């Protein structure tokens, strides 16, 4: 072995006095205070320093190799070893045999090795307690040290046997065996971690004895002393270069094998940790624990393993900012919502106000993102709804028209055989010409127009009822008073109390009358023919005036002709009953003509009134549906918000808002 600072400066003078083997060795040892460092073989993780006290050792040994003794001789010499492991020869002049000297040197070497092993084991145990992460490495090192110690002991035992057998050999053999013993001791001390630096200049058995004694003294002093604060690290290669069995290839192989084992252990630990950690979503920052696996002269490997049962950190997402361009209408809506939320905050407790404010902010931002539909979109929605309503109205109108036709067919009287044919024609005409629905926009129609139409419909109904009642009255009057001879009363109406002048009427009647006299039957026939001619002329005039309503007029003409025939039949019957009165009184003839004209006009008005009734019913339904539609959009039902623009304006106009409804 080699040391930087040798503990003793030795001066050795070797003199070969004679060829026979007389040797004298003198050693003078100065006593400086030095420090030695102990290092481990592969894992030099710790370093211990030992301070030595000053010592003085002077010894003179003289060997006489002239007389060689047998190895079997058991001679006892006066050699004494103290507790401090320093020896002194009582009889310095007396020389010891070689066998005993060699055995002593071997025993001392064994003691030194045992002491070094004990120190190394203690140091390793302390390191194991302090460094938990390096347990595996230290255990490996301890096992290596123990194996090396066992090898050293075996080598020493083998050397003992060799030395006992080789006592009869020359001095050169003795010195060679001493060299081997010293080399084995140096290798063992280097592998266990404690190295002592000794320069071997003399290779005689005396030097072996002295060096062994000095080593024993040094080891005992090392055990009793404390380590100083300052440490000196010794490189790995300096401890090994002086070893004769040193090979760099072997060291590199050992390092590679150690690193492979360490990596395998680390991988196994990481796999175990990963299997234990399950379902981890939230996290904290992992604490890095550095475990020193191997520290050699070439490289150091460190591994970072996360502590188990710790959660990885969450990926903090940076908030993305979106630009929102609110419109004027959305701002108005925001003002409303903000006022409502402020009123709600007053009722919330103080420990919840912060949370409620944050929620309100998020709510308002989301409300800003909601777009308000434009006017074009609203119009398209309204048009679709109107089209659906119109389809429904058309279906309803067709059903109503069919029902009215059936009811009119059943209610009409059938006096003659010709009447059913005429009714069938009327029903066909009504079905072929259905009433077209009124298509008018909502904005153009107001409440006033609706009222005007309703009033007109009501007045027309009242007129029809009055005219029908007047017809019945006039017919009853003619029957009653014509038979009793009370014609003057007929002329006196409630509006006219006096009898009107009848000169012009009589003159016209005289011109029309013929001078020839005829029987009663002939006169009645002539009068009936004249009345029929007048009715035909009136019908022609009405047809010319009403060119637009062709179908209606044709039906009315047929009805009028039937009515006229019925009237003529009745008149014939009445004339047969009261023939002399009618022939004498032309006023009655004029009244009958006027009544017939009124009946014709009423027959023309009735179908038109029916159409007006149907249109009025359709209009009423249309306005009922529109009123329901506007009620939904009014302030009465705030839950159904279909038109947000109008709602916002109405809400802004109303200061008091009931929050309970919302």
Swiss-Prot record:
Show the ranges annotated as biased composition (Polar residues).
162-176, 203-212
Name the domain of life this protein comes from. Answer: Eukaryota
Q: What is this protein called?
A: Putative uncharacterized protein DDB_G0292292
Basic and acidic residues bias (residue ranges): 77-87
Q: Where is the composition biased (Low complexity)?
A: 25-49, 109-161, 183-196, 213-224, 288-308, 413-434, 515-526, 535-575
**Quick one: where's region Disordered?**
1-94, 107-237, 288-328, 406-440, 506-580
Basic residues composition-biased segments: 226-235
């Amino acid at each position: 072995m080699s040391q930087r600072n040798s503990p003793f400066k030795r001066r050795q003078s070797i003199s070969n006095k004679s060829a026979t083997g007389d040797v004298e060795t003198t050693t003078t040892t100065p006593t400086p205070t030095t420090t030695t460092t102990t290092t481990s073989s592969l894992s030099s993780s710790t370093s211990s320093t030992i301070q030595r006290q000053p010592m003085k050792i002077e010894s003179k040994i003289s060997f006489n190799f002239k007389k060689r003794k047998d190895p079997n001789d058991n001679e006892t010499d006066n050699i004494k070893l103290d507790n401090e492991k320093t020896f002194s020869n009582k009889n310095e002049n007396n020389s010891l045999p070689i066998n005993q000297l060699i055995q002593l040197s071997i025993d001392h070497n064994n003691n030194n090795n045992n002491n070094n092993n004990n120190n190394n084991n203690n140091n390793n145990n302390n390191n194991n307690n302090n460094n938990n992460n390096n347990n595996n490495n230290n255990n490996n090192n301890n096992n290596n040290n123990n194996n090396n110690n066992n090898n050293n002991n075996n080598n020493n035992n083998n050397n003992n046997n060799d030395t006992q057998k080789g006592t009869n050999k020359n001095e050169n053999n003795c010195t060679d065996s001493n060299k081997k013993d010293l080399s084995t001791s140096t290798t063992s001390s280097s592998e266990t971690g404690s190295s002592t630096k000794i320069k071997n200049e003399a290779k005689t058995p005396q030097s072996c004895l002295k060096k062994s004694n000095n080593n024993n003294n040094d080891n005992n002093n090392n055990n009793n002393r404390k380590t100083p604060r300052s440490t000196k690290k010794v490189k790995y290669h300096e401890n090994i270069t002086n070893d004769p069995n040193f090979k760099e290839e072997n060291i590199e192989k050992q390092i590679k094998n150690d690193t492979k084992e360490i990596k395998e252990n680390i991988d196994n630990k990481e796999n175990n940790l990963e299997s234990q950690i399950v379902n981890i979503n939230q996290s904290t920052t992992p604490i890095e624990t550095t475990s020193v696996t191997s520290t050699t002269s070439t490289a150091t490997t460190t591994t970072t393993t996360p502590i188990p049962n710790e959660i990885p950190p969450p990926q903090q997402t940076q908030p993305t900012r979106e630009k929102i361009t609110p419109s004027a209408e959305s701002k108005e809506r925001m003002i409303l919502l903000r006022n409502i939320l402020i009123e709600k905050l007053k009722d919330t407790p103080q420990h919840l106000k912060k949370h409620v404010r944050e929620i309100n902010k998020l709510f308002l931002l989301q409300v800003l993102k909601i777009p308000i539909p434009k006017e074009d979109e609203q119009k398209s929605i309204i048009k679709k709804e109107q089209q659906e309503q119109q389809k429904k109205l058309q279906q309803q109108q067709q059903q109503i028209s069919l029902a009215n036709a059936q009811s009119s067919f059943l209610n009409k009287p059938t006096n003659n055989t010709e009447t059913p044919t005429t009714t069938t024609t009327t029903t066909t005409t009504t079905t072929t010409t259905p009433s077209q629905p009124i298509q008018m926009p909502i904005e153009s129609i107001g409440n006033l127009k609706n009222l005007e139409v309703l009033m007109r419909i009501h007045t027309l109904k009242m007129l029809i009822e009055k005219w029908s009642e007047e017809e019945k009255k006039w017919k009853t009057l003619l029957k009653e008073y014509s038979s009793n001879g009370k014609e003057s009363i007929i002329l006196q109406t409630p509006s006219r109390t006096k009898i009107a002048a009848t000169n012009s009427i009589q003159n016209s009647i005289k011109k029309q009358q013929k001078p020839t006299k005829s029987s009663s039957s002939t006169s009645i026939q002539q009068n009936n023919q004249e009345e029929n001619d007048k009715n035909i002329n009136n019908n022609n005039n009405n047809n010319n005036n009403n060119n637009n309503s062709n179908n209606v007029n044709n039906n009315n003409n047929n009805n009028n002709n039937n009515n006229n025939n019925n009237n003529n039949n009745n008149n014939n019957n009445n004339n047969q009953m009261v023939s002399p009165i009618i022939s004498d009184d032309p006023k009655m003839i004029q009244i009958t003509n006027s009544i017939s004209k009124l009946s014709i006009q009423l027959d023309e008005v009735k179908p038109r009134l029916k159409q007006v009734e149907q249109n009025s019913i359709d209009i009423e339904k249309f306005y009922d549906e529109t009123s329901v539609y506007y009620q939904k959009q009014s302030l009465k039902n705030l839950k159904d918000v279909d038109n947000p623009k109008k709602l916002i304006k109405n809400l802004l106009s109303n200061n008091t808002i009931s929050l309970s409804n919302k």
